């Protein structure tokens, strides 16, 4: 392990192995503790894509809210799952299967197409032609705006799905899906998230599907690994302190350097200023 690898692992808090049940408990307790300390909060809001990460955070959140209601007798504690399609989503069935699995207290659907297209048109009227890639980032940021709109009307906080395998590469939109109040699975890599979903009894197809941000229309359902040029297994091995090929290590470290500006992290399980 080189010095940079050790530094990255320490910063992202990744462990070489985990006990899935203990990490489930840890994330749930983190979310509950934040609610107990901030008694004006009554809901958590999370965008649901139908992929592994939002399915995991959603399942953990519903567990936390069920326990909060049982422990306090306050039925106003609610988990609000939000579908945020741009028009029609190709894998809508996966998103609905994820919501059914996590048994969210409330489900809202906000079609972001009108807002995104209006912004693109407004920019065009000023002479700015938005690229397909940039439009994808606008989609992510509109989704963030919608979630905060819902949270603001429901005494809520917005949850993010950032984890260490995503954070190391900066594979998220700054002030888009990177915009959140709490990130309950920060410290985990991709395979550890899979292990936690297996422990929770999630349908396999929700965490074995090919990961994709699916933001670009010119390249629909572009696999994360193709966009990054490195596999999640290689990223996970790197984060667990294992040896990876020189080519993979270079790509991972280049992504880490290039996206350093994105890692001004929201509140994690390791922050103590709010306690």
From Swiss-Prot:
Pathway: Cofactor biosynthesis; NAD(+) biosynthesis; NAD(+) from deamido-NAD(+) (ammonia route): step 1/1
CDD domains in the record: NAD_synthase (cd00553)
Residues binding deamido-NAD(+), per UniProt: 141, 174, 181, 261-262
Signal peptide feature range: none
Coiled-coil residue spans: none
GO terms of biological process kind: NAD biosynthetic process
PANTHER family found in the cross-reference section: NH 3 /GLUTAMINE-DEPENDENT NAD + SYNTHETASE, NH(3)-DEPENDENT NAD(+) SYNTHETASE
Function: Catalyzes the ATP-dependent amidation of deamido-NAD to form NAD. Uses ammonia as a nitrogen source.
Family per similarity comment: Belongs to the NAD synthetase family.
Protein's recorded name: NH(3)-dependent NAD(+) synthetase
